[in-house]
């Protein structure tokens, strides 16, 4: 069975969510480090220009959005608690809020001089300006309500207080972690660890929980090149789909919140939780791109 390949960069919160899951699941995995913003030629080739990071690959199957990546990790590792669709509605509602409203509040609350200096230090001054311009342009096209700095801080502090109240056990919904823990973790990792906000000082349960989450580590990834990843895709064929395949209608699919660059392909599978489209090129051969159903808009293309 092919190993999972993760396309990510160090400062990406959602990449940290998946890296922590990989540490918890104890899966071996391959790593391809990509730029903080487009152009990303390897993802243009494999994911049709899908612009959010991380993206995962296993052979000729490409997984876009952390929900489909998490479901694949759950399947490969035999840890069903990592798949959102396996959770009760209470957990699913928590994850939806943590992955959008709380995440955006964490990013805005973290955006100060310290975070800017860190970005410059880990990339370059010119790359930082390009990154900021890219994120400003992405924000202008977003369909989510932006919050200001003070409101973002209040949201994050309220979130921390909620976690403090929830943590009567080692993890948010019981004695062992589930997808909710990883969804809550990555935003606080960004605002408290990377940006250095001291907002966990009066939240001992959350601080201890964060330490437990960090202790999972990232496993032992092996770095490969973008060319290696493309070669693996070209030499593989997509995994067989479950019964219920679609007819191959030309479609575009795009996130409905932000980073809404559409990806085109042929619809080959759809159910209550995911959509799969096919794409093909001489460079990669036939690929199947997997997207979550929720939060994505599929538009049929007419001649």
Residue ranges and their predicted role:
Residues 36, 170-172, 238, 284:
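Preference for short coil/turn "hinge" residues that link or interrupt alpha-helices
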Residues 251-253:
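Generic structural signal for buried aliphatic residues
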Residues 214-247:
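Mixed-charge, Lys/Arg-rich low-complexity intrinsically disordered regions
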Residues 98-215:
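GST-like fold's C-terminal all-alpha helical module
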Residues 2, 6-14, 208-224:
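N-terminal short leaders/motifs
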């Amino acid at each position: 069975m092919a190993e999972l390949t993760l396309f990510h960069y160090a400062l990406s919160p959602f990449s940290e969510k998946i890296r922590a899951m990989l540490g918890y699941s104890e899966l071996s995995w391959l790593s391809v480090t990509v730029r903080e913003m487009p152009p990303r030629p390897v993802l243009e080739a494999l994911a049709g220009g899908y612009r959010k990071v991380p993206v995962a690959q296993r052979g000729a199957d490409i997984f876009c959005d952390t929900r489909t990546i998490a479901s694949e990790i759950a399947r490969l590792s035999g840890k069903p608690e990592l798949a959102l669709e396996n959770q009760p509605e209470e957990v699913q509602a928590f994850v939806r809020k943590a992955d959008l409203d709380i995440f955006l509040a964490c990013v805005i609350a973290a955006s100060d001089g310290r975070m800017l200096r860190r970005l410059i230090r880990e990339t370059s001054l010119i790359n930082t300006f390009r990154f900021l311009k890219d994120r400003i342009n992405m924000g202008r096209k977003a369909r989510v309500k932006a919050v200001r700095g003070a409101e973002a801080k209040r949201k994050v502090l309220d979130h921390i207080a909620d976690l403090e109240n929830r943590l009567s056990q080692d993890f948010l919904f019981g004695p062992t972690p589930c997808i909710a823990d990883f969804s809550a973790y990555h935003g606080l990792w960004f605002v408290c660890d990377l940006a250095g906000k001291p907002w966990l000082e009066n939240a001992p349960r959350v601080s201890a929980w964060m330490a437990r989450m960090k202790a999972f580590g990232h496993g032992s990834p092996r770095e490969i090149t973008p060319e290696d990843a493309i070669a693996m895709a070209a030499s593989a064929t997509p995994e067989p789909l479950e019964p219920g395949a679609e007819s191959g209608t030309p479609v575009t699919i795009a996130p409905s919140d932000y980073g809404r660059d559409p990806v085109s392909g042929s619809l080959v599978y759809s159910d209550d939780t995911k959509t799969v489209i096919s794409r093909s090129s001489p460079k990669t051969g036939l690929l199947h791109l997997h997207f979550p159903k929720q939060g994505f808009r599929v538009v049929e293309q007419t001649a």
